[in-house]
């Protein structure tokens, strides 16, 4: 037996197999290498593009060396190159309003669930539903952040709670003020278990306490929670319509009061700064407030007259001066010191001893001979326009006649000149040939 040739054959077969499998392995390695090369090129191009976008080269002026559009540049700086500006990143602003960990008080009474505060009309239910459920955290820096958040939310809640309490009082007729949690409608709830840093949140001043009382005839007054005995000038005025039974509350805090007698202000009841209810207990039944109007109350109406701003300086024609002699009392009931309400006079009539105030029609410009004050006349009825039309027509007719006569004269002169030019030609032609021939032959 000769085993040599079979072994050589097997070796050659193995060599052929490796030779055939080597290109396949290379083909499998080429696509990952190409992908890595393309990824490196793309990363380099992206880095170069980001560097050019973030740090452009200042070629012409000092106002073009940033990557912001023109609308945002107006808010940041003027572009004169005299100063620097700091741009806050979006991550910092997002971290302010959406913190990673929930803000909570070190004790549970600082932020109660919505079911415990349900009997009191407070706007904190929506605020608590937006944030996740708080967990008790005992770190001291979080205590100060909680107090600031509660103060801001309580100040924002003063304007919303007064409107909800007035609508509930007018529809159901039940009083909305409670004795113990009286400060819950306008300030943040504070409990005795809370630390003193959070207990001072209740000392928030409000000026819209008028909306909590559902009185049909309330006096124009405001009261502060911390100092209820000190009267203040009226900022909220109740205007009563003669036909509608429900009163309308009109806020005229920005208007200036007229020269009227000072109304008697009603003092709000003393409100406890800190509630004494333990945790887990509901508020007691509300106590009814006295709703009888005092006989010395004064229901005043404040009238605002329009003021026309003039940019050209003070001129007597376009200024509307305010006078306090005659307020417009149409559709308004004014009760002075308990007297019976008098019917309002009809429009256009004035009481005795009162002179009419300045109106919009009294400020008209004095009528004169100017063309701006006579828009109702036609153009041809004015003397200036009529004279101008007549003179223009005469001048135009004369100019047209002059042109016509000039053309006629030129035509006649041209005709006469043609006849004079043709006559010597005929004479010369008839004269030259026979004379020369006769003279030559002669």
Swiss-Prot record:
The keyword Phosphoprotein applies. The chain crosses the membrane at residues 388-408. Cell surface proteoglycan that may bear heparan sulfate. May have a role in the organization of cell shape by affecting the actin cytoskeleton, possibly by transferring signals from the cell surface in a sugar-dependent mechanism. Interacts with TIAM1. Interacts with PTN (via heparan sulfate chains); this interaction mediates the neurite outgrowth-promoting signal from PTN to the cytoskeleton of growing neurites; this interaction mediates osteoblast recruitment. Interacts with MDK; this interaction induces SDC3 clustering; this interaction induces neuronal cell adhesion and neurite outgrowth. The modification Phosphotyrosine is found at residues 409, 419, 431, 441. Residues 1-44 form the signal peptide. GO terms for cellular component: Golgi lumen; membrane; microspike; plasma membrane. Residues 45-387 are extracellular. The keyword Phosphoprotein applies. Its main location: membrane. SMART domains: 4.1m. Residues 61-75 have a biased composition (Acidic residues). Residues 157-199, 276-287 have a biased composition (Low complexity). It comes from the Eukaryota. It comes from Mus musculus. Belongs to the syndecan proteoglycan family. This is Syndecan-3. GO terms for molecular function: identical protein binding. InterPro entries: Neurexin-like (IPR003585), Syndecan (IPR001050), Syndecan/Neurexin_dom (IPR027789), Syndecan_CS (IPR030479). It is found in: Cell membrane. Residues 409-442 are cytoplasmic. Residues 48-58, 433-442 have a biased composition (Basic and acidic residues). Glycans are attached at residues 78, 80, 82, 89, 107, 161-163, 170, 172, 315, 367. Keywords: Cell membrane, Glycoprotein, Heparan sulfate, Membrane, Phosphoprotein, Proteoglycan, Signal, Transmembrane, Transmembrane helix.
């Amino acid at each position: 037996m000769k085993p040599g040739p079979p072994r050589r054959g097997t070796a050659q077969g193995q060599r052929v197999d490796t030779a055939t499998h080597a290109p396949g392995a290379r083909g499998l390695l080429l696509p990952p290498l190409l992908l890595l090369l393309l990824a490196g090129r793309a990363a380099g191009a992206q880095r170069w593009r980001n560097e050019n976008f973030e740090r452009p080269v200042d070629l012409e002026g000092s106002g073009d060396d940033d990557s912001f559009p023109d609308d945002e540049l107006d808010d940041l700086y003027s572009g004169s190159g005299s100063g620097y500006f700091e741009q806050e990143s979006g991550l910092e602003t997002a971290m302010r309003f959406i913190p990673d960990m929930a803000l909570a008080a070190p004790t549970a009474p600082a932020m109660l669930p919505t079911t415990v505060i349900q009997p009191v009309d407070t706007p904190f239910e929506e605020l608590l539903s937006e944030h996740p459920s708080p967990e008790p955290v005992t770190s001291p820096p979080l205590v100060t952040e909680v107090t600031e958040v509660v103060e801001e939310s309580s100040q924002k809640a003063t304007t919303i709670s007064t409107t909800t309490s007035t609508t509930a009082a007018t529809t159901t007729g039940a009083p909305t003020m409670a004795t113990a949690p009286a400060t819950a409608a306008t300030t943040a709830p504070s409990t005795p278990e809370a630390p003193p840093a959070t207990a001072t949140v209740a000392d928030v001043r409000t000026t819209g306490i008028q909306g909590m009382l559902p009185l049909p005839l309330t006096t124009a007054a405001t009261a502060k929670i911390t100092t209820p005995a000190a009267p203040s000038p009226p900022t909220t005025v109740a205007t009563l319509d003669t036909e509608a039974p429900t009163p309308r509350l009109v806020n005229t805090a920005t208007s200036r009061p007229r020269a009227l007698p000072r109304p008697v202000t009603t003092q709000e009841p003393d409100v406890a700064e800190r509630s004494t209810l333990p945790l887990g207990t509901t508020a007691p039944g509300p106590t009814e407030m006295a709703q009888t109007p005092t006989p010395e109350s004064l229901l005043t109406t404040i009238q605002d007259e329009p003021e026309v701003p003039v940019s050209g300086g003070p001129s007597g024609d376009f200024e509307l001066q305010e006078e306090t002699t005659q307020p417009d009392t149409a559709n308004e009931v004014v009760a002075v010191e308990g007297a019976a309400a008098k019917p309002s006079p009809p429009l256009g009539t004035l009481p005795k001893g009162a002179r009419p105030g300045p109106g919009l029609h009294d400020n008209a410009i004095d009528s004169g001979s100017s063309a701006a004050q006579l828009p109702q006349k036609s153009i041809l009825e004015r003397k200036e326009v009529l004279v101008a039309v007549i003179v223009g027509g005469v001048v135009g007719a004369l100019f047209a006649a002059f042109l016509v006569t000039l053309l006629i004269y030129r035509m006649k002169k041209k005709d006469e000149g043609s006849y004079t030019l043709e006559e010597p030609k005929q004479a010369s032609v008839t004269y030259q040939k026979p004379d020369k021939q006769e003279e030559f032959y002669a």
